[in-house]
Amino acid sequence: MTVSTSAPTVRIGSRKSQLALVQTYWVQEELQKHFPDRQFDVETMETQGDKILDVALAKIGDKGLFTQELEDGMLGKRTDLAVHSLKDLPTNLPAGLMLGCVTKRVNPADALVLNAKHQGKDLASLPEGAVIGTSSLRRLAQLRYHFPHLTFKDVRGNVNTRLAKLDSNEYDAIILAAAGLERLDMANRIDQLIPPEISLHAVGQGALGIECREGDQEILSLLKVLEDENSRDRCLAERAFLRQLEGGCQVPIGVNTHLDGDNLTLTGMVASLDGQRLIKDTLSAPRKEAEKLGQDLALKLREQGAGEILAEILAEAGRG
């Protein structure tokens, strides 16, 4: 008589926010669908970024702000993988961990959400001095460059909290990731999808990044069913660009990528916080050279003065 030994439960780490859980439960359901004989459990954790809500993100620093507790869980063998919004995952991961999978990207654009009194308007037609809420230096710098007539104010909290602040007239409009609103079934709140000519999106925006222990072949084989090669190549180029610029999540660096067959085009941008200087350029390469493409574009922007802008920002934040 043979005794069957069931495979161990796979434990998935997640932040506790509504958006994080929607994303993590989607991953759990997809894995369960492909591997019905396996058990997948979700373990929720609170990250530093979830706890500190009264300080602007740029002032806290960003080394693992939304990821460290999840990473500690994997390194301590309490969890086997962690689901992140890829834009929150630092480009340099702790020793022993790796980016195991990039899921199919949804809309990576930024979205304008208006207070009811401004319905029908867009960024260009909002009145002089209108208060726009954003916690992202990338959005702030680009929008200041294009719309100097607007006023910008920090906004923190989860998506529902930010929308509540908008609806209670603390802001005339706020900027959020379209992907988050779509995943929360709130796409009806989007008043304008901001085109890349105005605001290049964050590195990895719109994709989920699933982190796991390096060399964990069992978990990596499970994650293959979630991998989207087009999204991965685009995001690898974007992350290499950010890494080469030595920028984190809280610096004004934006990107846009486009795949045409095997040809990958990357546009990258670095801007000063006051919106006075904006350096932008584009390069293309075969998709198999995605990481080199990102590095090359970063070096090209450095030659045009991007390094000086970033050094000023880091010095100002007290982290230079």
Curated annotation (Swiss-Prot):
Q: In which pathway does it act?
A: Porphyrin-containing compound metabolism; protoporphyrin-IX biosynthesis; coproporphyrinogen-III from 5-aminolevulinate: step 2/4; Porphyrin-containing compound metabolism; chlorophyll biosynthesis
Its recorded reaction(s) are: 4 porphobilinogen + H2O = hydroxymethylbilane + 4 NH4(+)
Per the UniProt record, the source organism is: Synechocystis sp. (strain ATCC 27184 / PCC 6803 / Kazusa)
EC numbers, comma separated: 2.5.1.61
Q: What does this protein do?
A: Tetrapolymerization of the monopyrrole PBG into the hydroxymethylbilane pre-uroporphyrinogen in several discrete steps.
Listed under GO biological process in this entry are: chlorophyll biosynthetic process; heme biosynthetic process; protoporphyrinogen IX biosynthetic process
Would the keyword ATP-binding be found if you checked this record's keyword annotation? Answer: no
InterPro entries hit by this protein: HemC, Porphobilin_deaminase_cofac_BS, Porphobilin_deaminase_N, Porphobilinogen_deaminase_C, Porphobilinogen_deaminase_C_sf
Task: Add the further remark from the entry.
Answer: The porphobilinogen subunits are added to the dipyrromethane group.
Protein name as catalogued: Porphobilinogen deaminase
Q: How is the cofactor bound?
A: Binds 1 dipyrromethane group covalently.
One Gene Ontology cellular component annotation? cytoplasm
Transferase is among the record's keywords: yes
Query: Which Gene Ontology molecular-function terms are recorded?
Result: hydroxymethylbilane synthase activity
> What is said about its interaction partners and assembly?
Monomer.
Needed co-factor(s): dipyrromethane
Q: Which residues carry this modification: S-(dipyrrolylmethanemethyl)cysteine?
A: 249
Q: HAMAP family attached here?
A: Porphobil_deam
Protein family membership = Belongs to the HMBS family.
Keywords assigned: Chlorophyll biosynthesis, Porphyrin biosynthesis, Transferase
